[in-house]
Amino acid sequence: MNDPWEEGLRLFEEGHFEQALYFLEDIDPIEVPDAAYYQALCYSQLGRAEEALKSLDLVIVQESNFLKILQARMIRAFLLTTEKRYPAAEKELKGMIDEGVESVQVFSNYGYVLWATGRGKEGVAWLNRAVTLDPGNANAMNSLGYILAEEGVFLERALQLCRKALALKPENPTYLDSLGWVYHRMGQDKVAKFYLEKAVRAQPDNPDFRQHQRMVLQSLGEESITKRRS
């Protein structure tokens, strides 16, 4: 049988995260420093945020490589954001920015957190910085486009950004939802319905996607269809 570390790493690289954890969880991170990092990545992919955060905390404490620590902190901030623990996410992101970190991931995540906590103009400014730093970054473009649509401003630019993001990752359900939502905000609900239905089919349990779909169907006079399907 292969060495547990090598087998766990192989399974991780193949995208078999549950199987990878079978091997990685039994490895002492003190003996194999990278074990905690890959454990965290597996937990994150499997939606086990709390376990991922604990592993990332261990990486940050024991790792000596600055880039690995920075990567762990960025993943930690992202997980805190997805869990809607915005004060903790903001503290982590602000700390990296104050240290001089210039990263599209940090800027876009920070912008989203600011917007989510009621500071829309500041959030848009940081997302613009992210897109300027990396004009081809799909996540930054999608986040900025979605937030512009939510704010009801610069809708043509929002449409352009979300279309570019989706062109880079055509099957990404979040990008499908964002583009559908932009079309809704522009009053083009028939087009919005097409993209939102694709997003819901890809992630039927996502409450935000379903809420957007319901609102569009209601606008089209078709809300009873969604109620029958729920």
Regions found by a protein language model. Give the residues of each.
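TPR/TPR-like (Sel1-like) alpha-helical repeat modules
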Residues: P29, V61-Q62, H184, D189-Q218, ...
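Conserved structural position within tetratricopeptide repeats
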Residues: E25-P29, V61-S64, K94-D98, R129-T132, ...
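Alpha-helical segment of the N-proximal tetratricopeptide repeat
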Residues: N2-D26, Y38, I75-K84
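Short coil turns that delineate tetratricopeptide repeat
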Residues: I30-V32, S64-L67, V101, P135, ...
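Structural signature of tandem alpha-helical TPR/SEL1-like repeats
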Residues: G15-Q19, G47-S55, E83-G95, A116-R129, ...
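TPR alpha-solenoid repeat register
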Residues: A35-Y37, I69-A72, V106, A140, ...
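Residue-level recognition of tetratricopeptide repeat
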Residues: L9, L41, F78, Y112, ...
